[in-house]
């Protein structure tokens, strides 16, 4: 039905200099130690290099899957989740109140690189970008902080990706999309699929529609689960 890449949340952060190793307990790549101690210690970050490292292998895998006729989903992490793998999360939360301008600067650079990544992903056969930024989920910070800073930055990422790609569909995790709608960053429209489909089957039909560029209020992890609410939620970014 779908093939999902990658198998961890460290691809983007590693491209920005995070030290990643294989976690012996869980058997997945994880940050071995933080590269920086504080937000103010983070220098100018490098550009993502798609010709080397694991990011290259992710894109190569997408091409292989596309050539096999698969529908490919690429998980992509938002700016704050990327930063939380370069510096302790505690420092990120402090920075939300004390260093907003620096976080905006870093996020703007990361956003530009994520847009490049999205373009490369589309070129290599990715059909859906599954976006999340769980470090600054709406239930972890105040509604005002989400609307004025964290949600706004995610909105900028998504608008830029949408503008830079032609056919990729964005899929927002449930927490992100609900918070997005509450904060006024998007509108929602229900798409009613034929009865008896799983979430993945309904999603597969929805992404074929030319008017659908963003979907939310659902979970990619429920691909094989029967539809419970009977609809797919099309989101339109404002």
Regions found by a protein language model. Name each.
Residues 1-93, 106-238:
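Catalytic cores of TIM-barrel enzymes
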Residues 91-101:
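A solvent-exposed, charged loop/short amphipathic helix patch at secondary-structure junctions
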